[in-house]
C-alpha cells in the first residue's frame, strides 16, 4: 500500500514538473490576446490594464516564433525557418525580471529553467552574463 502511495506521489510530481516546463501546451489566450496574436501587421501594440497578461502574451508569441511550434488557432505571422531574435526591456532589471522570467523562468533559480513560455525541451543552453541572458 505504501509503495503504491509513494509511486502515485512520484507520478503526480513528475506530471506537475512536465506541466510547469511546458506552459506553451496550456496557453489559452483571452479574446483580446488572440486578436493581438492574429493581427497581420508588421507593428502591433497590446495595450491593457496592469497584470492582465501583456508580458506573457508577448513571451508566448516569441516562444512560438523561436520554436516554430504554432497552435492550431494561430492566424498571425508564421516563420517557416529558424529565426534569430532579440528581446529586451528598458533596463537590465526589467529585462531580467520581466522578459527573462516570462521566456525561460525565474532568473535567480536555475531549477526554474523552462518554466516560462519556452518549453524546457526547446532550451538547449542558457548563459548568464552581467546584464544579459542568452538562451539557445
Predicted regions, residues:
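Phosphate/NTP-binding elements of NTP-utilizing enzymes
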Residues: 1-136
Amino acid at each position: 500500500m505504501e509503495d503504491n502511495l509513494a509511486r502515485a506521489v512520484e507520478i503526480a510530481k513528475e506530471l506537475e514538473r512536465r506541466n510547469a516546463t511546458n506552459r506553451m501546451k496550456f496557453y489559452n489566450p483571452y479574446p483580446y490576446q488572440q486578436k493581438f496574436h492574429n493581427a497581420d501587421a508588421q507593428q502591433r501594440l497590446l495595450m491593457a490594464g496592469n497584470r492582465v497578461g501583456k508580458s506573457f502574451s508577448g513571451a508566448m508569441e516569441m516562444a512560438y516564433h523561436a520554436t516554430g511550434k504554432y497552435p492550431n488557432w494561430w492566424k498571425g505571422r508564421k516563420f517557416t525557418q529558424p529565426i534569430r531574435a532579440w528581446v529586451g526591456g528598458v533596463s537590465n532589471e526589467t529585462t531580467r525580471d520581466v522578459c527573462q522570467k516570462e521566456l525561460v523562468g525565474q532568473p535567480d533559480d536555475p531549477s526554474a529553467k523552462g518554466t516560462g513560455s519556452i518549453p524546457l525541451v526547446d532550451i538547449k543552453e542558457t548563459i548568464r552574463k552581467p546584464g544579459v541572458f542568452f538562451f539557445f
